[in-house]
Structures are given as structure tokens and as C-alpha cells.
Amino acid sequence: MIEYLKGAIVGLTPTNLVIECAGVGYDVNVSLTTYSAYQGKKEGLIWITQLIREDAHLLYGFSTKEERTLFGQLTSVSGVGPTTARLILSSYAPQELAALITTGQADALKAVKGIGLKTAQRIIVDLKGKIQLETSSDEILSARTAVGDAALNTIASGEEAISALKMLGFADPAIRKAVKSILSEDSSLAVEDIIKRALRML
């Protein structure tokens, strides 16, 4: 199994990263958190989870071991597959997600596409005692009220956000309506922030 890949980053979108190692290019599925970590970088090391199926060999990559661990923990929960786990990690940063699970915020988890109330509750029951990430009192307080949005970046790309959301399986009309609404409130949002907000609306 592949532990990590290290090399030149030759392609990067909010959902995928292409990394070249020894002349071979690997297409890696990533979350928004990992996408943000590699923006503007020409080289990097990405931690890998490899899923082997009859019809495909899939790579999921993470900027930290902690995010990879969370991905593995999420996919160990009945009803949570790799696509849903990536959506959860795209909606909430690792520390944010750890705070949600620690404080039992099922409604916040339920806001993610593909997560119903029963699955959200199952995630909390199964993982509450397993989460190892440190969560500060401020993060827990934020989770108990409403999870704070990620820090805003400078320039947003609505079309890139729309394209990424399509790749995640959402319908075009609903995507455009959500993105338009988000940008009408704040046109300076970075693409990952647009997507995070849209994921909570779709």
C-alpha cells in the first residue's frame, strides 16, 4: 500500500491533485482542506489512503496524518463511504469536525449531503471516544452554537466552485443558485469558502 507520495504538483482543483513522482503522475482525490494546503505550491508530500476495488484503484490524499486518520475513522462508520467522508472533510476542517463529534452536534453533520440524522448520530456514537485531535474550548463553544466559517481569502472563483460542486455530484441549477446567493453576500470569498458554504446549502 502507498503511505505517501512526494513530488511535483502538476495539477490542482478543489477535488483532485495530480502529483508526479519518478515520472509517473498520480491523480489523487482531495478534500477542500487539503486543496487549500497545497494552493500555490509546486512540490509537496501528500499522505495517501489507497482503496482497491474490482473496477478501480482510488487514491485519497491528505495534507496531514490527522486528516487521513479522520477519513479512515469516518469510513469505518456504517453508511459512510469515501465520497461522503470527503464531503464531510470538505465541509469542516479536522479540528472543527473533531469539535462537532466531541460535542455531539448531529444537526451540523446532517447538513452534509448524504448524511441523515441516523448516520450523523451513528458517527457521533462510534467516534466520540476515538477522536484524538485536540480541540480548544473556543472550538467547542463554536461547535455548540454554529460552526464558524473558515478564514476568508482574497479572490473568489465562482466558476471553479461550480465546477468542483458538479464533480461532487450536485445538480447545476441548484449549484448556481447557491453560489450566486453566497457571492451576493460576499464577493471576496475564496473558492474553498464558496464551496464550504454551498455544501451547507445544497
UniProtKB/Swiss-Prot annotation:
Residues 153-202 are annotated as: Domain III. It is found in: Cytoplasm. Residues 143-153 are annotated as: Flexible linker. Keywords: Cytoplasm, DNA damage, DNA recombination, DNA repair, DNA-binding. GO terms for cellular component: cytoplasm; Holliday junction helicase complex; Holliday junction resolvase complex. Residues 64-142 are annotated as: Domain II. SMART domains: HhH1 (SM00278). It holds the Pfam family RuvA_N. One of its GO terms (molecular function) is four-way junction DNA binding. GO terms for biological process: DNA recombination; DNA repair. Residues 1-63 are annotated as: Domain I. InterPro entries: DNA_helicase_Holl-junc_RuvA_I (IPR013849), Hlx-hairpin-Hlx_DNA-bd_motif (IPR003583), NA-bd_OB-fold (IPR012340), RuvA (IPR000085), RuvA_2-like (IPR010994), RuvA_C (IPR011114), RuvA_C_sf (IPR036267). Belongs to the RuvA family. The RuvA-RuvB-RuvC complex processes Holliday junction (HJ) DNA during genetic recombination and DNA repair, while the RuvA-RuvB complex plays an important role in the rescue of blocked DNA replication forks via replication fork reversal (RFR). RuvA specifically binds to HJ cruciform DNA, conferring on it an open structure. The RuvB hexamer acts as an ATP-dependent pump, pulling dsDNA into and through the RuvAB complex. HJ branch migration allows RuvC to scan DNA until it finds its consensus sequence, where it cleaves and resolves the cruciform DNA. Homotetramer. Forms an RuvA(8)-RuvB(12)-Holliday junction (HJ) complex. HJ DNA is sandwiched between 2 RuvA tetramers; dsDNA enters through RuvA and exits via RuvB. An RuvB hexamer assembles on each DNA strand where it exits the tetramer. Each RuvB hexamer is contacted by two RuvA subunits (via domain III) on 2 adjacent RuvB subunits; this complex drives branch migration. In the full resolvosome a probable DNA-RuvA(4)-RuvB(12)-RuvC(2) complex forms which resolves the HJ. Has three domains with a flexible linker between the domains II and III and assumes an 'L' shape. Domain III is highly mobile and contacts RuvB. HAMAP family: DNA_HJ_migration_RuvA. This is Holliday junction branch migration complex subunit RuvA. The lineage of its organism: Bacteria, Pseudomonadati, Bacteroidota, Bacteroidia, Bacteroidales.
